[in-house]
Amino acid sequence: MDEEHLRTLIRTIVRETLNPNLVPIGVSNHHVHLTEEDFQKLFPGQKIEMLKKLRQHADFAAKQTVDLIGPKGTIEHVRLMGPYRSHSQVEIARSENFTLGIDAPIRMSGDLDGTPSIKVRSPYAEIEIQGVIVAKRHIHMSLEDAKRFGVKLGDSMQVEVDGDGGRKTIFDDVVARPREDFVLEMHIDTDEANAANVGLGNNSFGKVIIKKKN
């Protein structure tokens, strides 16, 4: 176990002891997941390189970035995420639909049927990917967390966030995503974070106020 994961474990134990309903918040900026095949098309002969580990132990931000090219505009220097995925996927904020000129739906990761396509450009090549979404807010959690909250995969939760400057916000329909290797963390995008005045650091928390909604 490396130092960062040890710190995460210590923070988790302390938090769950003091307030078991608190959930760390991770703010997801726009990013791209690629299959190994699509990565090789964009970065021939290269390997995806780790820039920074993320809270979910298998995931990392890569050194490589790409540009997203839509019918109306371009978003440059969009970070790739590793490891490789079985399907390529682009995640943006809702407001970035207007920049790009597309209409990406709010979906869970991997739910790509009927999603728009977009051109993805690297310094070496350009490809078109079908699979642009606005990620639906969700909570990664271990199986033990799910048992503690009384939820299962796909259940809807409600989380209260005390943003800076008195911007208390209640996020409804937060999807539970339990898995054995997941670490407790709520994911929201930059639009949602801005609305609640939540920072991009690792010190923001939400409080689960309704553990399960039918």
Curated annotation (Swiss-Prot):
Annotated binding of Zn(2+) 1, by residue: H31, H33, E91
Domain of life: Bacteria
Recorded GO CC terms: bacterial microcompartment
Chief localisation class: other
Disulfide cross-links: none
Binding of Zn(2+) 2, residues: H138, H140, H187
Residues binding CoA, per UniProt: V27, S28, N29, K72, R79, F98, N194
Keyword Acyltransferase (UniProt): yes
Protein's cellular compartments: Bacterial microcompartment
Gene Ontology BP annotations: propanediol catabolic process
Signal peptide positions on this chain: none
Residues that coordinate or bind phosphate: R85
GO molecular function, one term: metal ion binding
UniProt keyword annotations, A-Z: Acyltransferase, Bacterial microcompartment, Metal-binding, Transferase, Zinc
Enzyme Commission identifier(s): 2.3.1.222
Coiled coil: none
Domain comment (free text): Formed by 2 beta-barrels, each is capped on both ends by short alpha-helices.
Protein name: Phosphate propanoyltransferase
Organism from which the protein derives: Limosilactobacillus reuteri (strain DSM 20016)
Lineage of source species: Bacteria, Bacillati, Bacillota, Bacilli, Lactobacillales
Gene transcribed to yield this protein: pduL
